[in-house]
């Protein structure tokens, strides 16, 4: 379930699914180019709707913002969003994304793991990987993050393939 500008409606849908089906849901909250006020409103809406689990993501940069100066943005990284979720005091179980094949904006895996550690230190309780195609890369990644002191659970991100277009888009977005 993604939260949009009408986040409270999406949160209510999330709570309804949990109540009817007994299935824990994880709200996906993105913050790319968002204001603190917008994000605070979404956090409040999630809390009021009884959302407990949040996957905190920066989100994909829209094409028109690809070259923009992001230095003044309140949410340059998911870490900023994780900090605000934790500071809300609502006790969300906060997850974040990780990249066994290195985030496309990272210079290298060492930098990527350093940023991942920052997410965990900011209050992330679990990680879910981006889609990957080589189990060896995942095992190597898990070894390296454990070596870096990252001990939270890691969930392998699995996406059922339904079309060639879907997989091509996923590959483009994940670098």
How would you describe each model-predicted region?
Residues 31-48, 72-76:
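Glycine-rich anion/phosphate-binding loops
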Residues 35-45, 113-115, 139-146, 163-170:
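Catalytic cores of alpha/beta
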Residues 25-29, 54-56, 94-98, 120, ...:
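Hydrophobic faces of well-ordered beta-strands that scaffold small-molecule active sites
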Residues 1-7, 11-12:
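Single conserved hydrophobic/aromatic residue that forms the stacking wall/gate
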Residues 25-37, 95-111:
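Active-site mouth loops of central-metabolism enzymes
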Residues 72-99, 149-175:
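Active-site pocket-lining/capping segments in soluble small-molecule metabolic enzymes
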Residues 105-122, 127:
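Active-site glycine-rich loop that binds ribose-phosphate moieties when present
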